[in-house]
Amino acid sequence: MKTPLLVSHLLLISLTSCLGEFTWHRRYGHGVSEEDKGFGPIFEEQPINTIYPEESLEGKVSLNCRARASPFPVYKWRMNNGDVDLTNDRYSMVGGNLVINNPDKQKDAGIYYCLASNNYGMVRSTEATLSFGYLDPFPPEDRPEVKVKEGKGMVLLCDPPYHFPDDLSYRWLLNEFPVFITMDKRRFVSQTNGNLYIANVESSDRGNYSCFVSSPSITKSVFSKFIPLIPIPERTTKPYPADIVVQFKDIYTMMGQNVTLECFALGNPVPDIRWRKVLEPMPTTAEISTSGAVLKIFNIQLEDEGLYECEAENIRGKDKHQARIYVQAFPEWVEHINDTEVDIGSDLYWPCVATGKPIPTIRWLKNGYAYHKGELRLYDVTFENAGMYQCIAENAYGTIYANAELKILALAPTFEMNPMKKKILAAKGGRVIIECKPKAAPKPKFSWSKGTEWLVNSSRILIWEDGSLEINNITRNDGGIYTCFAENNRGKANSTGTLVITNPTRIILAPINADITVGENATMQCAASFDPSLDLTFVWSFNGYVIDFNKEITNIHYQRNFMLDANGELLIRNAQLKHAGRYTCTAQTIVDNSSASADLVVRGPPGPPGGLRIEDIRATSVALTWSRGSDNHSPISKYTIQTKTILSDDWKDAKTDPPIIEGNMESAKAVDLIPWMEYEFRVVATNTLGTGEPSIPSNRIKTDGAAPNVAPSDVGGGGGTNRELTITWAPLSREYHYGNNFGYIVAFKPFDGEEWKKVTVTNPDTGRYVHKDETMTPSTAFQVKVKAFNNKGDGPYSLIAVINSAQDAPSEAPTEVGVKVLSSSEISVHWKHVLEKIVESYQIRYWAGHDKEAAAHRVQVTSQEYSARLENLLPDTQYFIEVGACNSAGCGPSSDVIETFTRKAPPSQPPRIISSVRSGSRYIITWDHVVALSNESTVTGYKILYRPDGQHDGKLFSTHKHSIEVPIPRDGEYVVEVRAHSDGGDGVVSQVKISGVSTLSSGLLSLLLPSLGFLVFYSEF
């Protein structure tokens, strides 16, 4: 949406008088001289609306005004359209700034503006309001307590004290400062009135509440007396429907501002709040708070205007509220006035255009005083109209100023700044314009001479209104000295230049038309004759646009021949269809130019067909029509229709009717399509030079539905739980659904039965159906088959498959269940085999004593196994264990529960290796005894692993001593790992490296490297 425009023009015609009280024109005689560098005031800083806190300790306030001008400006202030009395001690000026000491609300509140002037004129600043801000304290009286039943909604009123301005922010204290309430879906503090809303009261809401009010404009905060809130307990809290109690009103806002809408509802349970813009999408800059109670629209635009709705809903009901946002716009310049110089006696068109909503009005100031309203036209104006002008656009929401200085020029003609060229070149037979542009006001009269001969207008010679001299059909005799004379009522002046005649530039070898195929090269020749005293350049253009040979993309295809003088030959390499068109060679000097053109035809594959339309949509075919594209100078031989379904990103050639679409056809059918499938279509054309670009794809269409014609595959099943028949199949992919309401019909009967039982499965993605029948005999053979259906009919049945119904779960529980505690983390469980043939596996369930049975872990073993090992158990922990027999139908009854305890954890301290000493052909490794902690298993011995460095396997020793002898390695390094052993398992490892070299290097003998090592167990240990 665009804001309306207001256009105002200042038209100055025949400027004729003087400036009045300003004297600058007197200094310069009859007008502004060329040396005049002065200018009127231009504001660099203007006063802004200011709020002075009544309780401020500063004791003064400043309103700023600063202008740039030459000479320096003089400043003056006005308040409520009266002059500010600067003789009063309370007022002072610092530069252009007004300083008010000890501001008084009764005397100083009002509207201020600044005037800045010098001898060029006066300008008036924007208006600024000085107001006095305050925030009174809350009344000292105590606030009564509030009692509310739990589950009911509640509002605590803030009732803020008297204040100015209105931009307050609100928070609520709970019991003490600075504990503030956090807003959520249940609690909301309105920033409109400050009230605290609780959707439904809970017992946790009990406490003392205080409304905390802040005024950011005067940086002051106050808070109310505390309000005791006492929730009344209820046996059961009754739900009640949503009730919107915080409602937003119709608002008018300004474009570019941020808008906040509040909406909060009481209700039990807490209502959910949703926002929408009625009949339109929400603004892209809209944000909804986490609680949902606040909608913020940032940088609102005109198109965001409209009706907004919030809806609150819980399980008991919903409530709605609507209000409208009206978006207005500050005035904004579309075109404004600028500093302007005009000749005395001339005309001026000075536009002033503003936009806004509502439409702004235009008024004018001259030298700070009201001058005119609306469109301003000035006739027959002189020096009196010079000065500072201000165009003011204003509506109900704002005012903008455009300032400009109007200078009146009055001076005798002078060529000092712009003399005639001393030497002018012109080609024989051509045309020349000799400019004559002196500075003069009013506009002078012009005359010309050649040598001693006065020139007058003729068929070849024309003196323009601006003083320029035009000569056509130039001959050698036109060469010579020319003088321009300019005269006005202020004086006269002249300027002289010499016209030199040169030979004309002519194309002597023009480019000729060419006809090529895509990928070939073409040469455009061009040569010219020219005056030898001048430099010649060639410029090539394509279809009216100059070819830029410096661009990398251009250099790929265009190349110029610089080898020959006066030759501008152009080579077009690897030409493409886009290079076909008109090429123009221009030979040019600084004096004249000559051009010649030729056409390049590039033959290639056809362009894309256009206007593709889809008609007569059926289940397996559609009719297509299109319009013929460009044949690119080679007749189209055939068309190809291509399709793409919603299930694929690839385009494929479609089968068509007729099978071959001749090049003179513009319609055909695509056949053998999939029913009830979404398709896109496109058409490509082919000629002898290749296949062209495809047409723009059609809109996506869906073919009509049809009954399925594909049967499900992989029909089978069996297994399941007691009294179940499980039937499975491979679901048909989406492309074979062929219609809406797709599903499956499952048919089954006992192997020797006569009558088929049929059931309907409506889920198109499922491939499984389970039939439950308490009378069904376990492990009974059934014949099954499946077919698909949709709203158009049924498809064919699949091949018949034979499956068995589920067998019964085992009926006996394992007996003689026993356990053996192996360590702190392992238990071995064993049981007696169940004799039933239908047992396929055993399941061991176990759980810790501090856990519930529902959290039990499970271990499954085959029916041939009668024991299992439980690992990763907690040390020193009570466990319960039971065993059950299972098959595909489920598990039978469990055994009696066995209670047992894991052993304490193994020692956590590694053995500290004291020494590693070589003695003859052996090493003696010695370590400290490991003492177990109170919650650890007692050390019963030590395990020593002797292995090559870098390998995990080695030789394992055990001992009750604190040392061991191991052989010296034959070659390389070995690692000796030592760990304590206990009933709870093996402890943490220590290790040392030993070497097989004759002299033991201290660097190879590392003392204790505590870590959790890789533990290798051997059955013989």
Swiss-Prot record:
Similarity comment: family membership? Belongs to the immunoglobulin superfamily. Contactin family.
Q: Which compartment or compartments is the protein found in? A: Cell membrane
Q: Which SUPFAM superfamilies match?
A: Fibronectin type III (SSF49265), Immunoglobulin (SSF48726)
The residues covered by the Fibronectin type-III domain are 608-706, 711-808, 813-908, 909-1002
Q: Which GO terms describe its molecular function?
A: carbohydrate binding; cell-cell adhesion mediator activity
Specify the glycosylation sites in chain numbering: N208, N258, N338, N457, N473, N494, N521, N593, N935
Say where the lipid (GPI-anchor amidated serine) is covalently attached. S1001
Q: Which Pfam families match?
A: fn3, I-set, ig, Ig_3
Annotated source species: Rattus norvegicus
In terms of PANTHER family, this protein maps to: CONTACTIN-1, PROTEIN SIDEKICK
What protein name is recorded for this chain?
Contactin-1
| Keywords assigned | Cell adhesion, Cell membrane, Disulfide bond, Glycoprotein, GPI-anchor, Immunoglobulin domain, Lipoprotein, Membrane, Notch signaling pathway, Repeat, Signal
